[in-house]
């Protein structure tokens, strides 16, 4: 029973739950970026290059024979994957940059000095009176 309670304590920690949410959102974001690159970015680029569909770009190493599919280097899909990565990396970079800026602003925000208590105020007045008495001839 000890292992189960340890696992439960581990699983409900804030960091683990936050990480799980981040992974799920990251996977969904990856799908959105893949669709954006494949369906929005690549078609105009292919059109500018001369009507090329990047997902079909490949070098056939061995032609298909019977039931055996062809062996190809699908470099067009690789180019799309590289663009996916660049967009995701840039989005993460910008997010981290914003978070770091917010953290710096929080750290720099001046805090008001604490109001001295009545006892501290009284002690300060006594100190000032003693200093004044010591200065008099």
UniProtKB/Swiss-Prot annotation:
Q: What is its main location?
A: membrane
Gene Ontology CC:
plasma membrane
**UniProt entry tagged with the keyword Transport:** yes
A molecular function GO annotation: mechanosensitive monoatomic ion channel activity
A Pfam family it matches: MscL
Q: Would you say which domain of life the source belongs to?
A: Bacteria
Which residues are listed as membrane-spanning? 9-29, 79-99
Q: How does the protein's chain sit in the membrane according to the entry?
A: Multi-pass membrane protein
> Where would one find the signal peptide in this protein?
none
The record's keywords, sorted A to Z, are: Cell inner membrane, Cell membrane, Ion channel, Ion transport, Membrane, Transmembrane, Transmembrane helix, Transport
**Cellular localisation:** Cell inner membrane
Q: Which InterPro entries match?
A: Mechanosensitive_channel_CS, MS_channel, MSC/AndL, MscL_channel
HAMAP family recorded: MscL
Family of the protein in this entry = Belongs to the MscL family.
Its biological purpose: Channel that opens in response to stretch forces in the membrane lipid bilayer. May participate in the regulation of osmotic pressure changes within the cell.
**Partners and quaternary state?**
Homopentamer.
Q: What is this protein called?
A: Large-conductance mechanosensitive channel
| Organism of origin | Pseudomonas entomophila (strain L48)
Name of the gene encoding the protein in the UniProt record: mscL
